[in-house]
Amino acid sequence: MLQRSVFFLSDRTGITAETLGHSLLTQFDGIEWKKHYASFLDSAAKVQEIIDRINTIAKQEGQPSLVFSTLLDPVILASVRQADCYLIDFFESCLGVLETALQQSPVRIPGRSHILGQDASYFRRIAAIQYALNSDDGSNSKILADADVILVGVSRSGKTPVCVYLALQYGVLAANYPFTPEDMGVVRLPSLLQPLREKLFGLTLSTSRLQAVRVERYPGSHYASFVECQRELQWQNELYQQFNIPFIDTTGVSIEEISASIINRMRLERRLYGT
């Protein structure tokens, strides 16, 4: 398999460069990426160190490295341009277009999107994360009614990580409720969920995937058997159909896609960054 080195450079956290860069790299198959990260490049010494590293690796591999950048300082950026690399700078390519459209020069302040408490977004995120943790697995029924969305599904179907992601990325108040064997039998909504039906969104997955997840945690148990996983999923999916609960099959789907689908289908408000 072809190998290529790729660098993610930033004068702050590097989250933007990493996220956008990874999204672009997924469009190219058959390449093993050797990833290098450098954040908080805020001095000439740090920048020179990473430039030397880029040049050394390029010489070793006999080809320029790829560099994804969100560097804002034009002097630092100019230095990186001299390295033996293909530079993809997200801010520089976008800021020029925005400057023309808005007829205003950018302030070029690194880390401005991460300034603590600069607006209500920070506090919304913290509150949403705290809510997701407090309401995990239906542990606090008194606050379920406060949810923007309540994820339902059998045990180990991935509800908790999706709730936390919805809170972290969108500021959504996401609770979750696990269907247990005690709920199963007659296909009906648990009494706690009946008045909250409009907030429910279901997660499902393949029997083999659910079994694999459960076996990791409880190997050899009845809980992790194929027959039990199949039985629980069949009951759950019949419930979704009977009560018209929207749901998504999460088998092989990323948490980002699952969350975006929930936001879209439930028409939830994005509470962060003014979106």
From Swiss-Prot:
Highest taxon above the source species: Bacteria
Catalytic activities: [pyruvate, water dikinase] + ADP = [pyruvate, water dikinase]-phosphate + AMP + H(+); [pyruvate, water dikinase]-phosphate + phosphate + H(+) = [pyruvate, water dikinase] + diphosphate
Annotated ADP binding sites: 153-160
EC number: 2.7.11.33, 2.7.4.28
Enzyme superclass (EC): transferase
Keywords: Kinase, Nucleotide-binding, Serine/threonine-protein kinase, Transferase
One GO molecular-function entry: protein serine/threonine kinase activity
InterPro entries in UniProt: Kinase-pyrophosphorylase, PSRP
UniProt keyword annotation of Kinase present: yes
Pfam family, one: Kinase-PPPase
Keyword Transferase: yes
Family matches, as PANTHER family: PYRUVATE, PHOSPHATE DIKINASE REGULATORY PROTEIN 1, CHLOROPLASTIC
Family the entry assigns: Belongs to the pyruvate, phosphate/water dikinase regulatory protein family. PSRP subfamily.
Task of the protein: Bifunctional serine/threonine kinase and phosphorylase involved in the regulation of the phosphoenolpyruvate synthase (PEPS) by catalyzing its phosphorylation/dephosphorylation.
Protein name: Putative phosphoenolpyruvate synthase regulatory protein
Organism encoding this protein: Nitrosomonas eutropha (strain DSM 101675 / C91 / Nm57)
